[in-house]
């Protein structure tokens, strides 16, 4: 009997093992048959902004041509989600203009997105934005599932442009973790959002509802449908990560109502008179005037930006360029301004604006013209001429609006007769407006807006840094040596870096000489600062004799003959020794042709030759250093003299 029982037990065990092995084999066969679904990379167009896509991490394919300036980019390295996804990828260097795949990851919003020029794309600055993103090469991360189609924040998505289907009832898994995504059934009326978070409890399957048509729940508000307590909320996870739920996008609007008028891209400061002489009623008229101007301008990050400084005894910023990004917000801020009282020290206010207002910290964009509109009741109680000159040298276009100016009898009390003409850079009436009385001020709104937006006529925006053709004439003789030659090129790069370089602004060219001459690159070859700096790096050391006279003649023929008529012509010659040929006639010819010549001598250079080469007076145009490593000390002196000379030219 015992033997039978043992036999039966052995049979049962044997059957169990057979079934187990069969099951494992069957499972392996089924696993082999179940092929992993093929991942399809979604395609998007160049104008698709990251903020329109609700996925927090995804791979997309960009088309060619996204380097186009129509596709705006805000920031550098970390981009505001209002940016073009593909434009940002080109700017960052992940893609070139031929397109390709990129990996996009959303991150938290931040303040102070900095604009920069990189890889053929000019990104813009932005004071702050609620969501950011970063881009990298389009290589999938191990263990991360990426969506094959993208979900957009509204039904009017740009998905159709790229062949995508925007789906509101199905959300892609959130990448960034190897854990399985958790699908959350959303509250009534909201859009589905998927998220993974290993430290949060999963919601109950019955927590949501499939009912539709109800008002979406605001972020942070407890939903009755989710029960008590609300331990898990997709809104909380998204906000912590810097993301905004779709219902917030629809109610609070990810993008501003207007990006501003791009045809009037100026950085504008109003200096309003808050002195005691005005009185409350006229101060209110002044504020209404500002409001009307703000409404007419169409303020926004892609158009004009506006700030206000009030002055009396001393100036004070009411709000700066980055404080308000639309006309309505500016209007509301103006209404809150209260009068300071005191004197009418407009000169002190202009100095304050020049030194403090037009800075990156205060939202100055750099590429936009700087405009300061000074409003004066009667006349200033201090001098404005010197402060205005310094402002113009800094590239600030000054407009003066004088209301109820001094009568003939009152002019004897003025510190500075004709103060408005002394303040502006043109006395042709373009920069100064005279208003007979405060009740006529409203008539000035349209004329002023038209003038500040006419960037072609803003002569003061043409500064010493954006209005020249600069040709570098570089000594490549044997006495320089390879190491010192690289130091010379660094000096050339340091000088070039100070200028605003483009086809419309400053252009840079360079040639090298020994006994012979060689054009390294002309004025029309590179139109961006980065391209110019890279071209300077590529200049190779030649080695040979020192024929400086022939080099100057060559520069006039090969470089400056192609200079634009409206450009100042600047020649910056660097040499380390005495010339083997005559320099007098070529130098005189350069001066005769209007080429302003700076002569930089190093080590064995002859001071008498430097003085002959340099434009008169030589003390302002000829510089000498005893060794190559000290060349960097000359950079600020050259820049200062270039600007001083530019600003001393007749303006009227």
From Swiss-Prot:
Cellular component GO terms held in the UniProt record: extracellular region; interstitial matrix
Signal peptide boundaries: 1-26
Domain LCCL positions: 40-133
Localization annotation: Secreted, Extracellular space, Extracellular matrix
Polar residues bias (residue ranges): 196-212
Keyword Disulfide bond: yes
PROSITE patterns, per the entry: LCCL (PS50820), VWFA (PS50234)
Compositional bias of kind Low complexity: 145-158
Region (Disordered): 137-181, 196-231
Main localisation: secreted
The keyword Repeat is annotated on this UniProt entry: yes
Keywords: Disulfide bond, Extracellular matrix, Glycoprotein, Neurogenesis, Repeat, Secreted, Signal
GO terms (BP aspect): extracellular matrix organization; positive regulation of cell-substrate adhesion; spinal cord development
VWFA domain location: 267-452, 469-638
Positions annotated with a glycan in the UniProt record: 494
Cited SMART domains: LCCL, VWA
Recorded superkingdom: Eukaryota
SS bond list: 46-62, 66-86
Function: Promotes matrix assembly and cell adhesiveness. Plays a role in spinal cord formation by regulating the proliferation and differentiation of neural stem cells.
Subunit comment: Binds dermatan sulfate and chondroitin sulfate.
Protein name: Vitrin
């Amino acid at each position: 009997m015992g033997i039978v029982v043992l036999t039966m037990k052995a049979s049962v065990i044997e059957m169990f093992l057979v079934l187990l092995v069969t099951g494992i084999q069957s499972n392996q066969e089924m696993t082999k048959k179940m092929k992993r679904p093929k991942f399809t990379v979604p395609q998007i167009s160049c104008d698709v902004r990251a903020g329109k896509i609700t996925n927090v991490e995804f791979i997309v394919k960009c088309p060619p041509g996204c380097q186009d300036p129509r596709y705006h980019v805000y920031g550098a390295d970390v981009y505001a989600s209002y940016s073009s996804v593909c434009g940002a990828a080109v700017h960052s260097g992940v893609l070139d203009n031929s397109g390709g795949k990129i990996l996009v990851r959303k991150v938290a919003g931040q303040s102070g997105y900095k604009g920069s020029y990189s890889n053929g794309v000019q990104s813009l600055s932005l004071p702050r934005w609620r969501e950011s993103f970063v881009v990298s090469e389009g290589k999938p991360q191990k263990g991360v599932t990426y969506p094959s189609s993208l979900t957009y924040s509204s039904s009017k998505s740009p998905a159709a442009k790229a062949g995508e289907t925007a789906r509101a009832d199905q959300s892609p898994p959130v990448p960034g973790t190897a854990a399985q995504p958790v699908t959350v059934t959303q509250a009534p009326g909201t859009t589905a959002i998927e998220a993974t978070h290993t430290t949060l409890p999963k919601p109950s399957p019955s927590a949501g509802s499939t009912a539709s048509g109800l008002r979406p729940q605001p972020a942070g508000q407890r939903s009755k449908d989710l029960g008590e307590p609300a331990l898990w909320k997709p809104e909380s996870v998204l906000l912590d990560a810097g993301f905004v739920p779709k219902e917030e996008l629809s109610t609070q609007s990810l993008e501003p109502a207007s990006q501003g008028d791009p045809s009037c891209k100026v950085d504008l400061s109003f200096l309003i008179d808050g002195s005691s002489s005005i009185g409350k009623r006229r101060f209110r008229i002044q504020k209404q005037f500002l409001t009307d101007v703000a409404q007419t301008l169409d303020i926004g990050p892609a158009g004009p930006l506006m700030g206000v400084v009030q002055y009396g005894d001393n100036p004070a910023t009411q709000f700066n360029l980055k404080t308000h990004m639309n006309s309505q917000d500016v209007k509301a801020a103006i209404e809150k301004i209260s009068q300071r009282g005191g004197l009418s020290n407009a000169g002190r206010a202009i100095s304050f604006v020049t030194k403090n207002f037009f800075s990156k910290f205060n939202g100055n964009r750099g590429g936009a013209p700087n405009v300061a509109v000074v409003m004066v009741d009667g006349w200033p109680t201090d001098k404005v001429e010197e402060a205005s000159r310094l402002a113009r040298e800094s590239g600030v276009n000054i407009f003066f609006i004088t209301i109820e100016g001094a009568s003939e009898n009152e002019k004897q009390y003025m510190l500075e007769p004709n103060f408005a003409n002394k303040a502006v850079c043109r006395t042709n009436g373009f920069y100064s407006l005279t208003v007979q009385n405060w009740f006529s001020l409203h008539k000035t709104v349209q004329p002023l807006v038209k003038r500040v937006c006419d960037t072609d006529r803003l002569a003061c925006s043409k500064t010493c840094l954006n209005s020249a053709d600069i040709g570098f004439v570089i000594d490549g003789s044997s006495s320089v040596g390879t190491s010192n030659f690289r130091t010379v090129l660094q000096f050339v790069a340091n000088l070039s870096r100070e200028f605003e370089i483009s086809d419309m602004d400053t252009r840079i060219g360079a040639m090298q000489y020994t006994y012979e001459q060689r054009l390294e690159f002309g004025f029309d070859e590179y139109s961006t600062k980065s391209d110019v700096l890279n071209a300077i790096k590529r200049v190779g050391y030649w080695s040979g004799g020192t024929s400086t006279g022939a080099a100057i003649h060559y520069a006039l023929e090969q470089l400056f003959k192609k200079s634009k008529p409206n450009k100042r012509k600047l020649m910056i010659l660097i040499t380390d020794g005495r010339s083997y040929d005559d320099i007098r006639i070529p130098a005189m010819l350069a001066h005769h042709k209007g080429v302003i010549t700076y002569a930089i001598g190093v080590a064995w250079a002859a001071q008498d030759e430097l003085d002959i080469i340099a434009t008169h007076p030589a003390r302002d145009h000829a510089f000498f250093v005893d060794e190559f490593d000290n060349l960097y000390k000359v950079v600020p002196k050259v820049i200062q003299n270039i600007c001083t000379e530019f600003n001393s030219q007749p303006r009227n």
